[in-house]
Amino acid sequence: MKNYNKYIFLLTLLSYVGIFAQEKIDSITKMDADGEGFRTVLVQINNLYIAGQPEKKGLDKLKSLGVTTVVNLRTDGEMNNRDIVPYDEASYIDSLGMKYVHIPLGGKENPYTPEALIKFNEAIKQADGKVLLHCTVAWRASHLWTAYLVKYKGLDIDTAIELGRQINLGTLPLESFLDKKITLKDN
């Protein structure tokens, strides 16, 4: 009987862990990206902001709203082009007292990998405040966040994709070719 009670307790505990591991999305709040100093997209989901490329005023605004960590998915080539990004983002973020995490994604040199997702999860876990995740127009950021919801927050892939589409995930090219929505299954 004693082992049976331990077994029941363990099963109950594991079921609670599964329930609490799922991300509760209170809402996806779309903000005025241009007015706040961001390119194309700015949304808030709980303690995470997802956006396109921030201007300095955008970073200032998010710092005032409690953002302490900025995760940038743009490549070095993108970030070093002063015609595209007219300031040194990493240095500016440092001057604001915020943490800068660079996970470049895009092209053969910076492929989408499980390691990139692991780095993002670590950045989220280590953040002591709100987090900004950004790329150029929030497309890569939407994809990374969607994968994060599946791998680390227990959402099924179709639910995560629907949430990602509310930001800037877009449609799968296959859906455009076939002119219909595709449903994916986890294996």
Identify the function of each model-found stretch.
Residues I8-G18:
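Bacterial N-terminal signal peptides
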Residues L132-S142:
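A phosphate-binding catalytic loop at a beta-strand-loop-alpha-helix junction
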